[in-house]
Amino acid sequence: MARGIFITATGTDIGKTYVTALIIKRLRETNINCGYYKAALSEAERRDGKLIAGDANYVYNIANIKGDPNDAVSYIFQQAVSPHLAAKLNNVEISMERIKKDFYSIKNKYDYITVEGSGGIVCPISTGKEKIMLDNIIKIFKLPAIVVADAGLGTINSTILTLQYMKEKNISVKMILLNNYNHEDIIHIENKGYLSDNLLIPVYTCNKNANNLEIPVEKLIEIYEEI
């Protein structure tokens, strides 16, 4: 039975892909067969007439995953917009059946699977024939989640609002990870302290431009659940 986790964030460009890559890298360095999946990806680069799934490509390179990164993403769009809008612009109908098929195909290849979301937690994936929100994908695969937040000013508000939404959707949050953390920045220190003191969820940090996570691998293994 495979084990899985979902990586979401308090907003766009917080560092989900960066953190996702470091988590998978950490596990794979300890000989854990960990893979990657993303339902929909925007802002893909076109090379030689082919769209390249940039986020997946980054994760595969950092975590040393073999194979074609495009195979880890169900829907790849060039426009730098939300998946639902990209689908509209390209006349594409996003299907939960295809997402499920691709997810289970990836899942069958790995013992651990790390699923990356799109944007923040409130993200429409499809507003076409099927109405799909990001939380629908999390729940259909029964995945627990990690919330990535920026360490700086405003993160207390955005983190707590994100957690409240996820609680309403009955999504289990296993960890908060403050990205771009500076151990000498008083705001970062205070934010971590406040969240740690007022939440029942463990709060970890990731230093800016870090090549590795400081989180013990045992802690990472613990938060992945059977799926």
Swiss-Prot record:
Disulfide-bond pairs as recorded: none
Catalytic reaction equation(s): (7R,8S)-7,8-diammoniononanoate + CO2 + ATP = (4R,5S)-dethiobiotin + ADP + phosphate + 3 H(+)
GO cellular component, one term: cytosol
Residues at the catalytic site: 38
Binding, ATP: 13-18, 55, 116-119, 179-180
Protein name as catalogued: ATP-dependent dethiobiotin synthetase BioD
UniProt binding sites for Mg(2+): 17, 55, 116
Gene Ontology MF terms in the entry: ATP binding; dethiobiotin synthase activity; magnesium ion binding
Cofactors named for this entry: Mg(2+)
Subunit record text: Homodimer.
Binding-site positions, substrate: 42
Gene coding for it: bioD
GO biological process: biotin biosynthetic process
Function: Catalyzes a mechanistically unusual reaction, the ATP-dependent insertion of CO2 between the N7 and N8 nitrogen atoms of 7,8-diaminopelargonic acid (DAPA, also called 7,8-diammoniononanoate) to form a ureido ring.
Enzyme Commission identifier(s): 6.3.3.3
UniProt keywords, alphabetically: ATP-binding, Biotin biosynthesis, Cytoplasm, Ligase, Magnesium, Metal-binding, Nucleotide-binding
InterPro entries for the chain: DTB_synth_BioD (IPR004472), P-loop_NTPase (IPR027417)
Family: Belongs to the dethiobiotin synthetase family.
Pathway assigned to this chain's UniProt record: Cofactor biosynthesis; biotin biosynthesis; biotin from 7,8-diaminononanoate: step 1/2
Source taxon at top rank: Bacteria
Subcellular location: Cytoplasm
